[in-house]
């Protein structure tokens, strides 16, 4: 039942992007659901992470704020799998990640499931790079207005909706991705979300990213308990 709900949610998201007719988008759905159906091996995920990911994302998956590299520790399992599938099918643009998922060791749904479980089991990020605090109150207001209904009040994300946790994430990475959303450079997102970001002013994006980078707390992913 849970997997069926995920499938329905995912298909609805792809329909709202207008890209469901594309072969890439269809394939992302198929690959994501395949990976979620597999029994994940966190130990294999740890080995894969050490071999394939640690160079950019760091030994504890804390990312690198100064280089716009996101923290992955404690991130939602379903979301990680979906993004790896999207990179694999070039439904999300990131040249370095296209190279990573083209490697044999990281090219299959089983590897994505293993990596996602390992990452979700890690302690949450700490010491995220933040902004200057100038627009924090504006950022909090923007979050409550535009983001909390999907990402939850505390930005923990949602297991069933492929909605990522945003808290403890690096400020510069968040700003970059929000600008990508506003510019239409993220193909695998809901059109309403992209439209919301197109309507945000620069100081609202700055404040929103700064506010999220300072939010603390663990993420408890129900999918990891199955």
Language-model features and meaning:
Residues 45, 53-59, 115, 144-154, ...:
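The canonical Cys-X-X-Cys-His
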Residues 1-39, 85, 214-226:
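N-terminal export/targeting leaders of redox proteins
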Residues 23-48, 64-68, 117-142, 221, ...:
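Electrostatic cytochrome c docking/interface patches
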Residues 35, 46, 58, 62-92, ...:
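Gly/Gly-Pro-rich "capping" loops immediately C-terminal to redox-active cysteine motifs
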Residues 65-71, 87-122, 127-133, 160-165, ...:
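Axial heme c-ligation environment in periplasmic c-type cytochrome domains
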